[in-house]
Design a protein with these regions (language model features):
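Small/polar-rich, solvent-exposed N-terminal microdomains that initiate assembly or binding
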Residues: 1-56, 103
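Short, charged interaction patches at domain edges and termini
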Residues: 1-13, 53-58, 106-151
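Residues in well-ordered beta-strands of folded domains
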Residues: 46, 64, 139-141
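Short acidic, glycine/tyrosine-flanked loop/strand segments centered on an H-E-D-like triad
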Residues: 62-81
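Short histidine-centered catalytic/ligand-binding loop motif
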Residues: 75-93
């Protein structure tokens, strides 16, 4: 069964070809390199679970689209934008997430008989990691045909 590898490879390829991303990693979110040695902006793929049905396997995944927050020492007088680039990161990384999901819906993943089920859920984060990262956790389910037989 190679559908798992094909799914994560297609996600990696879709993310890697887009601007506003320098690196794609995979695994548990705790495995993300938070020592400022990674090349940000960064996307990280995690697998939440899989459901096996009669004819398909449903892969529930989250892709984290993130960048380092750059704090400006100038005093913030508006109290709206803040003295960092958090809003810029949320804007660019949501645009990246939207583009990647659309590519997966219409691109090679779709032509390889995979499909995203339903809509992707996007959750912003601004204080999830110790390295002042901000971005989006995008969760979605990809259905793949099972190529396993019981014979």
């Amino acid at each position: 069964m190679r559908s798992f590898f094909r799914v994560i490879d297609q996600i990696k390829q879709a993310v890697s070809t887009e601007p506003f991303n320098n690196q794609v990693t995979f695994g548990d979110i705790a495995d993300v390199d938070l020592r400022k040695q990674s090349m940000f902006p960064l996307s990280h793929i995690t697998v939440n679970n899989a459901t096996i049905t009669t004819n398909i396997v449903q892969h529930n995944m989250t892709v984290f689209f993130m960048d380092l927050v750059d704090v400006n020492n100038a005093e913030d007088e508006s109290f709206f934008l803040g003295n960092d680039n958090t809003q810029d990161i949320l804007n660019t990384q949501l645009a990246l997430a939207t583009r990647v999901i659309q590519l997966l819906r219409k691109g090679d993943l779709y032509r390889q008989e995979f499909e995203i089920e339903g809509d992707a859920t996007c959750e912003p984060f601004t204080e999830r990691f110790e390295n002042r990262l901000a971005g989006w956790a995008v969760t979605f389910t990809i259905n793949t045909k099972t190529d396993m037989t019981i014979c």
